[in-house]
Amino acid sequence: MGRGSGANSIVAFSLWITDVDPLELDLYFERFINPYRTSPPDFDIDFSWDERDDVTDYIFKRYGREHVALLATYSTFKGKSILREVGKVYGLPKAEIDMLINYPEKKEYQNDITAKIFQLDRLMEGFPNHLSIHAGGIIISQTPLTRYTALEMMPKGFPITHWDMHVAEDIGYYKYDILSQRGLGHIKESVDIIKENIGVEIDIHQVTNFKTDEGVKAQLRSGHCIGCFYVESPAMRGLLKKLRCDNYLSLVAASSIIRPGVAQSGMMREYIFRFHNPNNFKYIHPIMEKLLQETYGVMVYQEDVIKVAHHFAGIDLADADILRRGMSGKSRSKNEMLRITDTFFNNCNERGYPEAISKEVWRQIESFSGYSFSKAHSASFAVESFQSLYLKTYFPKEFMVAVINNFGGFYRTEFYVHEARMNGANILAPCVHHSNHLTRIIGDDIYLGFVHVKELEKKSIRAILKERQERPFDDLEDFISRTKIHLEQLIILIKIGALRFTGLGKKQLLWEVHLLLGNKNKIPESLELFKVKSQKFELPTLTHTKLDDALDELELLGFPLCSPFELLKEQIKEEEYSLKGKEDTNARILKSIKDIERRQKVWSSKLSTDLEALESALDSLSHVDIKNEL
């Protein structure tokens, strides 16, 4: 999937590099290429996370390893790490270095050596430390790269240059960004699973149909977007509900205004108000109304910075592009930014703008600092969100399996399992007859993959899958003799319920496996001429409960497969599950709080939790004065 400013190109859309129609959104082509642009145009291309290495390998083979290399980034010396590294050079023990870092002002740690260390600390700040690999940058050279730079082999087997992206641009090399993301993996695998499970083929590029689909629009408007690319976080779902977003244009804007700068500057709140009250606000200046009418006078995209700087403040397009890069965190010169800042205010003063208006416009520009999207980038993300939403709306079980298998979502696996259960799936523990390495769906039954079982070795999984291809397992003895899995691994499989095909309970299976393997000296396979039948013993009746299963699952999966409500000693009455008509009343929470996100402040903490209900889920954000109690 092509994204970023390259999606401004109608040629890219025509070649199926992107699914973004630039004419539909009146995208600003000059953001991609213009005569005044100070850097080469950049085209970001995303692949599924599990395909990027294959694509990179193809590029090296296609153009030759002498002509291709990954770009480097410079990791620099920073802060306390300088003291630590220089202290090692001077032979100081770790304990003394720690004291020097934590208590630099203490006189007992001040001597000629420490004075030299602190002097070097100031001098080395920002110096290169070591090379790292750029997130996805690749350069291709017509002549062998070793004519221009040394190459260094990385553990993945691909060489890197001794340049970063800025040096490569200065020399004249164009960078190709081969990036990856897991959202594409969700979509790609969903399409495959849907075809396999229910026989429906989907053309995922029919984005125009997805944008106008009433079911998808309702899903978007309600914020039911768990698992969907870029729109599943609590903040994003909350924004969608506030905007009552149900169309492409609104989602494109929402994808950009959710970024930290706009939210912290208060402009996100202002945008929501203006979105719902288009006749109840005033534009800060007539020029701003002309430039930003589509976004109600709020700068939302990087293009807005360019347009406002050029048309409002009279900054030429070359400097406007430098300003845009600076706001994106890509500027290399503080002096350049200071010069453009002075130019902005001087030009505004010459044009007779009130100082308050000039400062407010600049404040909005500064909100883009470090993290901002071009409109084309937001549009690319919105298209992928619509693709995810379509799959979740009409094929929720298969979609959630794909989300679970690709990992890397906003929530833990447990949350996605609960979401699948709420959409009608039967969640089943791993099974040696039905489960694969990854999670699998058969009809409405979802069998968790062996990959989720802690301490289960890959060679054990491979042995199970290999033998199962030959024929099903007859019983416990047949399973043990064919897979050759040792006792500790068998105990894990029993506790997670993977050997339930035997018809025996977990405790009985544990007895059986210890009788078969517990005290047996392992005989080399080549020396065992005849298969000796094991002796059978009568065992007492052994029982286990749902609570036993839940505890085993907590230990091996990290979460129980049943609903926590099923484990209650006294079952809650059905009507008590509903919250209707119970506003302003206290409620008890039945949920273990596992993930706590605390942002420490002087006066409070933020407690962010995910709460599960029987047929729903709730994100909770609390301001609490219990900084030291959690």
Model-predicted regions and their roles:
Residues 1-630:
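Noncatalytic, beta-rich nucleic-acid-contacting surfaces in large DNA/RNA-processing enzymes
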